[in-house]
């Protein structure tokens, strides 16, 4: 298959483009200066300056949707660049209480907020839901891993204008899935690249991160002419796995592996094809039999494979993104345009915790024959599953994600604010996302060099190959209408917003390529001729073996007929549905002392499936929020927020749990939506010194879906294992943020000095299991990030040409109480623990700075973990917990989860 070439943007090409534009810009600038100089020399009289009107696009604010802003964090494209955000893990690096859920195979599974994660935190781009985290049920025996997916598609941050992170139930704003919060992205337009009244603009970004040897190259081009405008952004990224602290790589590691060797015992033999003159002539050169034995080997930490591996699994990451947006302004009020987005990411990993060798604990095949060709002792020695001792094993996971979006939009904006509507936005989008999770286990290249691309062939007896693949597709056809109106009535101001939407969605999971293939080669000894001395395996009377005839064996394990209710089921799991919603919001300013906000949303969702064992139905959800801000003085705000959230069962939960047997034995879930209630109190101090905000929050969750069975009247389980609305929980916590301007505190301190502070703590207050259920575990709050505070101190020169910043992060240890739970077994219960490993407290210091060489070129440098501190984050170790998406099991050494040592990120930005 010929690989299609695609355009690669390099640092050199970006620099060449930028230099050309710089030259053109300088030429125009010189011409303008010459004309200006001539005019100045001709004019000696005073002139009256002309009035200049300056307009700027509104910057996203955390109080846009909800008057209190409690639990809200806004990040703009400028702050994303300033914080050198290159991937999903960088986005919330300095935001305590929000963490990334590791998928376990390089990708991610969304965010964790206030004790909940994955599908309980909504993820949207321009109002479009992104893919759910679809975790596939594992096979009953998954000793070598399986294709479990569970990832989400990742967002390209160079296409993003702003990000809003909302902590606490937010379904009145963002609908299904915003049970514990939401992360929403707003895409860029041409206006975000064009500066002032310029008709064209170019931006380039080239970055390098040492922690994963990652390169980022991005080019954005925008222009406008007449009523037309357009934007094109191309971004390419490539990297490897995040490096562990270098101290962890010192030393060597040892292991024992199976080998084949000759043994002086009574099974001597000769090979027929090695005896051209007959059996009798070969007796003097009879060979001792081959047997399986053990050999100890010592290798570097980087080369070691097995459960005790320290270095992270090697990964190759590639990403490409095209983003196009443009349209035509028919007038100052009317605009129509289109959007096209194509992104793809590839996470290719070799799981080196899986031994490249055959372990002595493997069970040998009793059918092993002692013969071998020439001196190749391991040619036919193998273990029970058919893997030969002379080959190396490699376990590979490929996560390939692809997203394509096509949309049109119409915008009406009445800038003089006269009329019924100030602004209306009508958009229609089609979004297709494909997540391809492919597992391959190869055992067909000579030890110690495994190969991803080798396959069993007849010339490699007891070579072996196994694969498994899950392709998840999610499609949304979405229509959205947003209406805005501002009404000013003396001392009362209304900011009214109406939202209507329709989403036609499809979820399809295809299990495929679930197969095993091996080469078998065996032979029985040739019996002696009548009247001759019997061949008994002694040196004087060795066995005579013919050359084995190899043949292929194996099977396709997939059942495509839909008659299997276990992991072998490869029929497409198809769920279709429609969602309608209406939302309204009114943010009011009652004079200068009170702000009041009210918001409601009503969702109706219907689903259907291609088989009766999938749970479908109709859900009606009403969500709301209210907030009030009382401002008794100019320097004090008292805030209160009350909001709700909901989550309908995920597509994976609707499909249910399959454990074999007939389809009529599969439990079909009967679900209620999960719901949440978020309550927050806030106190804010503000003034020339900056602002300080302290808030206390309480989050109550009801009807959380978990794996369980129903309880019968006699106190035993009914055996209908599956997903049920099983649990309720309540969490409380404190959040503190501060931004201080030292010049505002004391005028003697030079302008530009500032400090920041952030702290978050979450505590489990109550949890219980719903009555009538058995075999259910209480919710393990391993999703809670340990308490963390972040202190920043920085300086920006008054000219904004350079600045420096230092950020100190302190994390507490993971609490054992959050990892302990109860497993209810009828009237009895037992303790369960999420994982054996807890993380200790840790702290690091990061420093960063920027320098503008001129108005077009900026250089940024960040040095992270400046003092090379050795630590492990809970987010990394959580991959070993019970609730992990693809749980790392039988971990022998947790050092592999250690964070990077001192590392740096260098970014060159150019704007013209």
From Swiss-Prot:
Record-level Gene Ontology MF annotations: ferric iron transmembrane transporter activity; siderophore uptake transmembrane transporter activity
Keyword Transport: yes
Sequence motif TonB C-terminal box, residues: 895-912
GO biological-process terms attached to the record: siderophore transmembrane transport
Cysteine disulfide links: none
Cited Pfam families: Plug, TonB_dep_Rec_b-barrel
Keywords: Cell outer membrane, Membrane, Receptor, Signal, TonB box, Transmembrane, Transmembrane beta strand, Transport, Virulence
InterPro entries: Plug_dom, Plug_dom_sf, TonB-dep_rcpt-like, TonB-dep_rcpt_b-brl, TonB_box_CS, TonB_Hb/transfer/lactofer_rcpt, TonB_lacto/transferrin_rcpt, TonB_rcpt_b-brl_sf
Subcellular location as annotated: Cell outer membrane
Originating gene: tbpA
TBDR plug domain: residues covered: 63-188
Function: Haemophilus acquires iron by extracting it from serum transferrin (TF) in its human host. Acts as a transferrin receptor and is required for transferrin utilization.
Coiled coil regions in record: none
Cited Gene3D superfamilies: TonB-dependent receptor, beta-barrel domain, TonB-dependent receptor, plug domain
Protein name: Transferrin-binding protein A
Bilayer disposition of the protein: Multi-pass membrane protein
Position of the signal peptide: 1-23
Main location: membrane
Boundaries of every TBDR beta-barrel domain copy: 199-912
Family recorded in the similarity comment: Belongs to the TonB-dependent receptor family.
PROSITE patterns reported for this sequence: TONB_DEPENDENT_REC_1 (PS00430), TONB_DEPENDENT_REC_2 (PS01156), TONB_DEPENDENT_REC_3 (PS52016)
GO CC terms of this entry: cell outer membrane
SUPFAM superfamilies: Porins (SSF56935)
Residue window of motif TonB box: 50-57
Keyword Membrane: yes
């Amino acid at each position: 298959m010929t690989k299609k070439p695609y355009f690669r943007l390099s640092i050199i090409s970006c620099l060449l483009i930028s230099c050309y534009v710089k030259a053109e810009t300088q030429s125009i600038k010189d011409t303008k200066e010459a004309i200006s100089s001539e005019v100045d020399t001709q004019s000696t009289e005073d002139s009256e300056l002309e009035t200049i009107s300056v307009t700027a696009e509104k910057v996203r604010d955390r109080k846009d949707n909800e008057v209190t802003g409690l639990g809200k964090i806004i990040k703009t494209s400028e702050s994303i660049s300033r914080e050198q955000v290159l991937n999903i893990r960088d986005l919330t690096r300095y935001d305590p209480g929000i963490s990334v859920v590791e998928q376990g195979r390089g990708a991610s599974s969304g965010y964790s907020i206030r004790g909940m994660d994955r599908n309980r935190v909504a993820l949207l781009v321009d109002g479009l839901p992104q893919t759910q985290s679809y975790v596939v049920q594992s096979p009953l025996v998954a000793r070598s891993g399986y294709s479990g997916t569970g990832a989400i598609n990742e967002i390209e941050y160079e296409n993003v204008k702003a990000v809003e992170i909302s902590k606490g139930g937010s379904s009145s704003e963002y609908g299904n899935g915003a049970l514990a919060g939401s992360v929403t992205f707003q895409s860029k337009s041409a206006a975000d690249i064009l500066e002032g009244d310029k008709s064209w603009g170019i931006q380039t970004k080239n970055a390098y991160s040492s922690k994963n040897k990652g390169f980022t190259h991005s080019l954005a081009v925008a222009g406008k002419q007449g009523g037309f405008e357009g934007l094109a952004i191309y971004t390419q990224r490539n990297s490897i796995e995040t490096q562990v602290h270098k101290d962890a790589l010192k030393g060597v590691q040892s292991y024992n592996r199976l080998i084949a060797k000759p043994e002086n015992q009574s099974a001597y033999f000769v090979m027929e094809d090695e005896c051209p003159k007959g059996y009798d002539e070969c007796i003097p050169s009879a060979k001792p039999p081959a047997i399986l034995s053990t050999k100890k080997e010592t290798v570097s930490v980087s080369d070691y494979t097995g459960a005790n591996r320290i270095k992270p699994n090697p990964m190759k990451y590639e990403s490409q993104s095209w983003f196009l947006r443009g349209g035509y302004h028919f007038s100052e009020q009317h605009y129509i345009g289109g959007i096209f987005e194509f992104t793809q990411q590839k996470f290719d990993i070799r799981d080196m915790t899986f031994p490249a060798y055959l372990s002595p604990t493997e069970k040998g095949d009793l059918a092993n024959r002692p013969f071998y060709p020439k001196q190749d002792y391991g040619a036919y020695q193998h273990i029970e599953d058919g893997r030969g001792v002379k080959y190396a094993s490699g376990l590979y996971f490929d996560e390939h994600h692809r997203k394509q979006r096509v949309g049109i939009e119409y915008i009406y904006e009445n800038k003089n604010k006269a009329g019924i509507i100030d602004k209306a936005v009508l958009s229609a989008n089609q979004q297709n996302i494909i997540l391809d999770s492919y597992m391959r286990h190869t055992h067909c290249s000579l030890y110690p060099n495994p190969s991803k691309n080798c396959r069993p062939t007849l010339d490699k007896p007891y070579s072996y190959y196994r694969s498994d693949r899950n392709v998840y597709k999610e499609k949304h056809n979405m229509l959205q209408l947003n209406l805005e109106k501002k009404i000013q009535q003396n001392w009362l101001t209304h900011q009214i917003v109406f939202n209507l939407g329709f989403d036609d969605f499809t979820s399809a999971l295809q299990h495929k390529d679930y197969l095993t293939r091996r080469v078998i080669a065996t032979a029985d000894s040739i019996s002696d001729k009548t009247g001759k001395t019997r061949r008994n395996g002694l040196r004087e009377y060795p066995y005579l073996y013919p050359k084995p005839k190899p043949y292929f064996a194996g099977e396709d394990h997939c059942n495509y007929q839909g008659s299997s209710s276990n992991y072998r089921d490869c029929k497409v799991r198809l769920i279709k549905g429609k969602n309608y919603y209406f939302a309204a919001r009114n943010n009011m300013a009652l004079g200068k002392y009170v702000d009041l906000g009210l918001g409601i949303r009503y969702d109706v969702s219907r689903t259907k499936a291609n088989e009766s064992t999938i749970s479908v139905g109709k859900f009606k959800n009403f969500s709301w929020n209210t907030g009030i801000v009382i401002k008794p003085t100019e320097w004090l705000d008292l805030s209160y927020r009350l909001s709700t959230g909901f989550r309908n069962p995920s597509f994976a939960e609707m499909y249910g749990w399959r454990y074999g047997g007939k389809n009529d034995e599969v439990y079909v879930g009967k679900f209620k939506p999960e719901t949440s209630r978020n309550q927050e109190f806030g106190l804010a101090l503000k003034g020339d010194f900056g602002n300080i905000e302290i808030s206390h929050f309480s989050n109550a969750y009801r009807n959380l879906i978990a794996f369980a069975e129903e309880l019968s009247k006699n106190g035993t389980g009914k055996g209908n294992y599956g997903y049920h609305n099983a649990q309720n929980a309540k969490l409380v916590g404190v959040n503190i943020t501060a931004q201080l301007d030292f010049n505002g505190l004391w005028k003697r301190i030079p302008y530009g000095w500032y400090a920041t502070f952030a702290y978050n703590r979450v505590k489990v207050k109550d949890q219980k299991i719903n009555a009538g259920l058995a075999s259910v575990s209480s919710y393990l709050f391993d999703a809670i990030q340990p308490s963390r505070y972040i202190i920043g101190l920085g300086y920006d020169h008054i000219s904004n040409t350079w600045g420096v910043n230092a950020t100190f992060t302190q994390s507490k240890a993971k609490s054992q109480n959050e990892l302990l739970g109860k497993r209810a077994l009828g009237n009895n219960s037992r303790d369960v623990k999420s994982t054996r490993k807890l993380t200790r407290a840790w702290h690091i210091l990061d420093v960063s700075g920027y320098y503008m060489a001129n108005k077009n070129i900026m250089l940024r440098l960040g040095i992270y973990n400046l003092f090379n501190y050795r630590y492990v984050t809970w987010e990394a170790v959580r991959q070993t917990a019970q609730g992990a998406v693809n749980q790392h099991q039988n971990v022998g050494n947790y050092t592999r989860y250690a964070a990077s040592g001192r590392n740096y990120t260098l970014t060159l930005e150019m704007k013209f």
